[in-house]
Amino acid sequence: MRTPITCLLAVLPLAANAAKPWQTVNDGETFKVDCEGTYQHHLQGVCTDETSIYWSFTTTLVKTDTTGKVLKKIPVANHHGDLCIHDGKLFVAVNLGKFNDPKGNADSWVYVYDADSLQQLARHETQEVFHGAGGIGVRDGRFFVVGGLPGGVEENYVYEYDDEFKFLKKHVIKSGHTLLGIQTATFAHDRWWFGCYGNPRILLVTDADFEMTGRYEIDCSLGIEGMTGGRLLVGSGRCEKDEGCNGTAMIAFPDPKTGFRFQNAAVQ
């Protein structure tokens, strides 16, 4: 979503894990990936097939290996938000209109890309996402789109689509208000994870039916993705004037007290 973003990156002792493949990182270890390069706009989301990492930088879609080396990148329409991967394809929440407009003057879409080549394959209208599509997750072959929220609204909304993007249902999360709605989404480890802006930034966790199970003051508003082995991949980044914006991804583990945790890191 269009809002100034400044995120602090954790300073990590990486030497012990620098040469270790991230697929084998276990609880108690640290793994961090810096996306190569800088970009005009800030990070919106990350996803992975555990072979490559995909990064949405608002107007640039980037594919890297698991060390952060760029393999492919393409310019994309403003505003590409959060993304997910399914069946060899990337699905990106896109808004071409106004975010967070109480009158619903958004223009919500999901754009589909080939995960190998980043070639665009399809565009699906998701105009039911009334305040602007900003995030997307997938579960059992169905897609769940989240997005903006005007001030004063004390709940969030999730819009469910089938595999051909036929609208199925609008779900309500009794979350209380979150600034500009929900930015990132993933279904992992039998629950939904939703990253939100704010001061402090907020993580919402629900069960599979969108009933709240936790609200945490921890930041995954720039990306969260489920991984095998009970792990999560969490995105972060920052923008520097005259230098551009960068992105980082770190492996985390669910934690019932804090939402999730990074090992050996002071997370801010």
What positions do the PLM features span?
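A short beta-strand motif characteristic of beta-propeller blades
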Residues: 28-37, 68-74, 119-126, 167-175, ...
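Beta-strand-rich domains and repeat architectures in extracellular enzymes and scaffolds
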Residues: 32-59, 79-81
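Repeated scaffold domains used in trafficking and secretory/extracellular systems
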Residues: 40-45, 78-85, 128-138, 178-184, ...
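Short coil/turn segments that connect the beta-strands within blades of beta-propeller domains
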Residues: 50-51, 87-88, 140-142, 189-190, ...
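Short, solvent-exposed loop/turn segments at conserved positions within beta-propeller repeat blades
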Residues: 55-56, 100-108, 149-155, 197-199, ...
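Short loop/turn segments that connect beta-strands within beta-propeller blades
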Residues: 65-69, 114-118, 162-166, 206-209
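Blade-loop segments of beta-propeller domains
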Residues: 69-100, 108
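Beta-propeller blade signature
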Residues: 105-115, 156-163, 248-261
